[in-house]
A protein has these predicted regions:
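Structural signature of outer-membrane beta-barrel channels/translocons
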Residues: 91-97, 105, 174-180, 238-244, ...
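Outer-membrane pore/translocation modules
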Residues: 111-299, 418-429
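Outer-membrane beta-barrel biogenesis signature
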Residues: 20-73, 182-186, 320, 424, ...
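Short loop/turn motifs that connect adjacent beta-strands in outer-membrane beta-barrel proteins
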Residues: 24-38, 97, 113, 178-189, ...
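Transmembrane beta-strands of outer-membrane beta-barrel proteins
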Residues: 38-44, 100-102, 171, 187-193, ...
Length: 449
């Protein structure tokens, strides 16, 4: 039996070594050339992503660093976000190794859940700074008698539901500048550019909140929108070189974002939120929205990343256009600082200042090409993010506000940041995201004509 397995492996390896080099899936591009004037690829992909992590919050501890005391991170919440989407993709070859493509995603669900963290097997509800909060956004007591006013509701598994809507349309172009199949002295070099249009319905995290600050979308029968209403520009390049049964590759990409006319801002509801009891925004900040202009609006991140990997080809039959390949890769993405949606948004109803962080992970993929016309793709990935703050706005322009004026936000102060909330942004009250895991699954069927 062992000899048979060894012979089979040897035959597959020899076939792969003898076969013409075929491009790795990461560099696959629709083409148009002599003998194949029209290349049309249609695929339907299911993507599932699960993000999990722990939210901690700074708290003053007089016993730490005596006699001065210090801020320590205390466990508050466990957070989960699960996204499921169907993504039809269409690609047309215009010229040799030159394609245009479009993706039309439909988000089945994008649900955010949280519950109290456990310490020594018990929920932290009784000692939670979320439950026992006593101040409003202007650092004023919620109640003269000292009654608490929780920041937001936390149940056994509070969930805010999103989805059941079309996502942002993505369109782009990809060009294989060099091809190792045509010239074995060169690698396959692919460059591409994608544009994501802000077509998904905008999500307003503060709209429709109850007296307890619960989201109107805590019912699965009333899922909310999820659109960010930003333009996204993605540039990427991939290099790959087939070496017998192994096809190593390298990818680099950068993504930039630009606000649209529909991009959400905390200033949209600042005036009405400042008049709530307890106040959810500062009175001075609401008055400053106009004078601060773009400085008060969403501040979008940019993302840059590298991927290193290889496809292993245990079987390939060029005459029948059949191929089995295994994809193994490692990747890392840097996400810059921002004031945008983050895991705290569905709870707080706000955009928050988020620290930069690094996402690192790996992917395992299996690709089965049954014929020239049909192939199946499946992959699983696991990643983690470096710990980062989810809140921490600067008090004023350049990080400071005029100390000679009221910095609470109760009375006028043109230097006060309209986004500043004493409950979330003051040192000693900031939230932090850690112990994260990002698990992804993707399955796709591809038809090629």
């Amino acid at each position: 039996m062992r000899r048979l397995r060894l012979r089979a492996l040897t035959i597959c390896t020899l076939v792969a070594l003898a076969a013409p080099a075929g491009a790795a899936e990461i560099t696959r591009v629709a083409t148009s050339e002599t003998g194949n004037l029209f290349d049309f690829h249609v695929s339907l992909r299911w993507d599932r992503t699960q993000l999990r992590g722990k939210l901690t919050r700074e708290q003053g501890d007089p016993a730490a660093n005596p006699p001065f005391g210090a801020n320590v991170d205390v466990d508050e919440l466990r957070y989960t976000r699960i996204t499921n989407a169907l993504v039809p993709r269409f690609a047309i070859g215009l010229h040799r190794d030159l394609e245009v493509h479009v993706e039309l995603p439909y988000v089945l669900a994008d649900d955010h859940s949280w519950r109290f963290a456990l310490v020594n097997g018990l929920p932290v509800e009784a000692v939670s700074t979320i439950t026992n909060n006593t101040i409003d956004a202007m650092n004023q007591p919620c109640d003269p008698g000292g009654a608490t006013c929780p920041l937001f509701p936390v149940g056994s598994n509070t969930t805010v539901y999103h989805g059941g809507r079309a996502g942002d349309v993505k369109a782009g172009v990809a060009w294989g500048i060099f091809s190792d199949a045509r010239d074995d002295t060169k690698p396959f070099w692919l460059v591409g550019a994608d544009l994501t249009f802000p077509t998904a319905s905008a999500y307003d995290p503060a709209a429709g909140r109850s007296a307890s600050w619960a989201s109107p979308h805590v019912s699965s029968g009333n899922p909310g929108a999820f659109g960010e209403k930003v333009w996204k520009y993605d540039l990427y390049t991939v290099l790959s070189r087939r070496l017998g049964p192994i096809d190593p590759y390298f990818k680099a990409h950068v993504t930039g974002m630009q606000r649209s006319s529909g991009t959400y801002s905390n200033c949209e509801h600042a005036a009405e939120l400042a008049r709530r009891a307890p106040a959810e925004a500062t009175l001075a900040g609401a008055a400053n929205c106009s004078s601060w202009g773009d400085d008060a609006r969403a501040r979008l991140p940019w993302i840059g990343g590298l991927t290193f990997g290889a496809e292993l080809v245990p079987y390939e039959n060029p005459s029948e256009d059949q191929k089995v390949s295994v994809d193994v890769r490692a990747f890392a993405d840097y996400t810059s600082s921002q004031r945008f949606y983050n895991p705290l948004t569905d709870m707080s109803g706000k955009l928050h200042a988020t620290e930069p962080y690094l996402t690192m992970g790996g992917l395992f993929g299996l690709y089965l090409r049954a014929s020239r016309f049909v192939s199946l793709h499946a992959s699983a990935s696991l990643a983690t993010q470096t710990a980062h703050f989810l809140s921490g706005e600067s008090l004023g322009r350049g990080g400071v506000a005029d100390a000679g004026k009221d910095i609470t936000g109760v009375t006028a102060n043109p230097d006060l940041n309209p986004n500043y909330d004493w409950r979330y942004d003051a040192p000693g009250r900031r939230f932090r995201f850690s112990e994260t895991s990002v698990f992804g699954l993707s399955v796709a069927g591809v038809l090629q004509f």
